[in-house]
């Protein structure tokens, strides 16, 4: 156990040894506009490791003083990665407004003028205390051993892909040691390996692999987001967390009127897509279309343009290892998406 012996000195004591070290606890201040446009000063300190995540005080997190090299670029970053610190593909900077509540997320989403602004705001969102605590705990004290010396993104993961894409893929949520580490959708885990390989076979990705942000990977003709943008404990976001994240994807689709195909990876993504478009005033078949691999539902935008929703089993290890989802099955859904999109 640890006992405090002074403002900057801690002592670890057990039955066999006594180890003493000094640790400077950094205090970093910075100014950042909140959702109402006013400037607030936030102060962040590095907490002592704990099994229980620290309560979110509403401040935008700054990097820990200890840094680790990015596995590709070699640049040093703290974890979580501060906005605008040079991480490959980071859409935000120190001036990006931050949502601290579900209502704030909805207001910031609605006011985003374009896709780059939306991506930036997504990537610094702090609307859900449980998700903020979990993603940052994993990024600091809960890293997987094989990635212990890598910096962790530790922030919400924005969508990836061109704003003029005609295919939009909806995932579930970032993996704690995957996208929560790399900062890019479906990057750094087995599910991502499967998905990007399939994209590449379909001519929808620049490369067959996606390991790190900055590795040259990029979607071609498709854009990909998720129902929830933060890694959730046990991969299970709550109903309230899914609802709080909904405005981000709603605004994204509103800014992409050329989309003709939605591909839902799993039942939660399917339900999210239907809920988003129904709230946006799209025509949705009744009764509610049921999810299934290869399922199709024809939706109608308010202007009458048809958009097809396609279902695919999620490329989780549970599905791919058991054969519930095969490469041929995933290829079939993507081929159908390409056909419907006019590619």
Predicted regions and their residues:
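Low-complexity, intrinsically disordered or signal/transmembrane-proximal segments
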Residues: 19, 40-42
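Intrinsically disordered, low-complexity segments enriched in small polar residues
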Residues: 6, 30-31, 37
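Intrinsic low-complexity, disordered N-terminal segments enriched in polar/charged/small residues
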Residues: 25-26
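A polyanion-binding, active-site-adjacent surface
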Residues: 69-299, 303-343
């Amino acid at each position: 156990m640890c006992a405090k012996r002074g403002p900057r000195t801690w002592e670890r004591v057990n039955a066999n040894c006594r180890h003493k070290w000094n640790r400077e606890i950094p205090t970093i201040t910075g100014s950042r506009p909140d959702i109402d446009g006013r400037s607030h000063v936030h102060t962040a300190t590095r907490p002592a490791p704990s099994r229980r995540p620290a309560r979110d005080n509403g401040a935008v997190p700054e990097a820990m003083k200890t840094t680790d090299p990015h596995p590709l670029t070699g640049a040093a970053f703290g974890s979580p990665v501060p906005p605008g610190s040079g991480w490959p593909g980071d859409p935000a900077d120190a001036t990006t407004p931050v949502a601290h509540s579900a209502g704030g997320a909805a207001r910031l989403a609605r006011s985003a003028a374009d896709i780059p602004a939306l991506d930036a705001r997504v990537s610094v969102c702090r609307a859900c205390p449980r998700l903020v605590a979990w993603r940052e705990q994993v990024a600091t004290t809960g890293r997987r051993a094989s990635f212990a010396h890598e910096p962790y993104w530790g922030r919400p993961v924005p969508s990836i892909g061109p704003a003029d894409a005609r295919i939009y893929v909806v995932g579930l949520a970032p993996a704690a040691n995957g996208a929560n580490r790399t900062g890019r959708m479906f990057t750094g885990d087995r599910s991502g390996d499967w998905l990007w390989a399939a994209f590449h076979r379909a001519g929808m990705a620049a490369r067959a692999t996606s390991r790190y942000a900055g590795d040259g990977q990029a979607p071609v003709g498709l854009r990909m987001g998720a129902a929830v943008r933060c890694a959730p404990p046990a991969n299970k976001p709550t109903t309230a967390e899914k609802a709080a994240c909904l405005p981000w994807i709603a605004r994204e689709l509103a800014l992409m009127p050329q989309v003709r195909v939605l591909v839902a990876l799993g039942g939660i993504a399917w339900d999210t897509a239907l809920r988003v478009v129904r709230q946006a005033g799209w025509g949705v078949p009744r009764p509610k279309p049921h999810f299934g691999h290869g399922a199709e539902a024809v939706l109608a935008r308010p202007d009458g343009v048809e958009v097809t929703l396609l279902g695919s089993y999620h490329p989780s290890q549970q599905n791919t290892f058991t054969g519930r989802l095969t490469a041929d099955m995933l290829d079939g859904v993507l081929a159908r998406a390409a056909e419907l999109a006019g590619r």
